Amino acid sequence: MDLVSALSLETWVLLAISLVLLYRYGTRKHELFKKQGIPGPKPLPFLGTVLNYYKGLWKFDMECYKKYGKTWGLFDGQTPLLAVTDPETIKNVLVKECFSVFTNRRDFGPVGIMSKAISISKDDEWKRYRALLSPTFTSGKLKEMFPVIEQYGDILVKYLRQKAKKGKPVTMKDVLGAYSMDVITSTSFGVNVDSLNNPEDPFVEKAKKLLRFDFFDPLLFSVVLFPFLTPVYEMLNICMFPKDSIEFFKKFVDRMKESRLDSKQKHRVDFLQLMMNSHNNSKDKVSHKALSDMEITAQSIIFIFAGYETTSSTLSFTLHSLATHPDIQKKLQDEIDEALPNKAPPTYDTVMEMEYLDMVLNETLRLYPIANRLERVCKKDVELNGVYIPKGSTVMIPSYALHHDPQHWSEPEEFQPERFSKENKGSIDPYVYLPFGNGPRNCLGMRFALMNMKLALTKIMQNFSFQPCKETQIPLKLSRQGLLQPEKPIVLKVVPRDAVITGA
């Protein structure tokens, strides 16, 4: 007897009802935007529209922008995402209603002690961290940190010269990733790591393990589809970040703190010391004015997580753009040579005042915003431009799509630093150019990142020119990863300039 005839009518009815209920549960929120006339791709039961992310976030957002216009609706599982591109609406989300409604970023799973990190923390806790950490990013503090970073620029130049002598093409991410890692670990943890020449250093290995982050990781994917799993994972002590790396950095910060507290010598200015000062200067160590040891560790780790990929990738994209636009490269070198004759050592003020360098970097950040999107969670039911958004929903700003919108940028796919000249940048709407976000919850490390990248580019351009080679992908194609990456590693020929910098 086959299975069909073996089951009674009642069983079939019960099965049909169960399937209908399961379908209704898996689509229970998917009518939210349709009822309000908001267009968007058709969501699948339980999955919503997340399968489209396999195209690449940047590509999917561009497709939606072209197809649906200024506003569209998506679903990460059951979580509604309202995509907005109108500058005034973006201003409302990022600035005007930041504290009242759109304070927080999205949860992305169980994070352990990293819930204390400024990028992940929420509401009053985030405000406290922001108030405590903002003074560490003033121009005065960055100027004091400049010599710490410059030494790694010298190591980078020396390494590139060795590679150039061999005449072999150089994979940019390998070299610039090591530079980025060294600068961040030095300023965040107070440790000197030469990862260019010591790639197997335990500190480097633990940091790189921390950075192996995949948007399509099963753990993250399960939380996106079923947010209620986050507290379950937390109870089971499951964490998105590798526990051995977190524990390693926690012990390291403890050791560095003890060493600096025991020593009577004046310590160099870096983020670790500045965070320790906020802790030590507080009269009440348990008050909101003091950063705890755990909080210091979380901030140090998030500096690696937030700074490594963005800095190394942006520098790689910049050098590819310069190599494929030799006239722009020459103009940048001329500015640097004029500001720093005879390859004089850069100073903070000189680097930050070079106009064309700023234009080149800004244009790279427009073409290649490493974070494709900005997202904010609604803390309460709200109406935004006539659209009802329930509490817990996400408002998404597709920064890559905005940066490539021909309504805002002429020939948006072309590398044109002149867009950011003194004459032109005043006409750029600050809510369609968002490489670091905007408003109170923008990137706290923006000034540090810009200084770091400008110093690296200055040192590099003083000493080398870059040219395409047979391994260079032209035009550059982008991968489908969560953060913006080239489809193939950027490989360029490094050509030493005539003069040689002494001591490098």
UniProtKB/Swiss-Prot annotation:
The record's section on InterPro entries has: Cyt_P450, Cyt_P450_CS, Cyt_P450_E_CYP3A, Cyt_P450_E_grp-II, Cyt_P450_sf, Cytochrome_P450_3A
Query: Which Pfam families does this chain map to?
Result: p450
Q: Which reaction does it catalyse?
A: an organic molecule + reduced [NADPH--hemoprotein reductase] + O2 = an alcohol + oxidized [NADPH--hemoprotein reductase] + H2O + H(+)
Membrane topology per record: Peripheral membrane protein
Supply the alphabetized keyword list: Endoplasmic reticulum, Heme, Iron, Membrane, Metal-binding, Microsome, Monooxygenase, Oxidoreductase
**Expressing tissues:** Highly expressed in liver.
Q: Which residues form the signal peptide?
A: none
Binding residue positions for heme: C443
PROSITE patterns found in the cross-reference section: CYTOCHROME_P450
Under which main EC class is this enzyme filed?
oxidoreductase
| Stated induction or repression of this protein's expression | By dexamethasone.
Q: So which cofactors does this thing need?
A: heme
Keyword S-adenosyl-L-methionine attached: no
Task: Give its E.C. classification number.
Answer: 1.14.14.1
A Gene Ontology CC term for this entry? Answer: endoplasmic reticulum membrane
Keyword Iron annotated: yes
Q: Which GO terms describe its molecular function?
A: heme binding; iron ion binding; monooxygenase activity; oxidoreductase activity, acting on paired donors, with incorporation or reduction of molecular oxygen, reduced flavin or flavoprotein as one donor, and incorporation of one atom of oxygen
Q: Which domain of life is it from?
A: Eukaryota
Q: Which SUPFAM superfamilies match?
A: Cytochrome P450
Q: Which GO terms describe its biological process?
A: response to bacterium
Task: Report the protein's function.
Answer: Catalyzes erythromycin N-demethylation, nifedipine oxidation and testosterone 6 beta-hydroxylation.
Question: What PANTHER family does its record include?
Answer: CYTOCHROME P450 3A-RELATED, CYTOCHROME P450 FAMILY 3
Family from the record: Belongs to the cytochrome P450 family.
Q: What is this protein called?
A: Cytochrome P450 3A11
Q: What is the lineage of its organism?
A: Eukaryota, Metazoa, Chordata, Craniata, Vertebrata
Task: State the encoding gene.
Answer: Cyp3a11
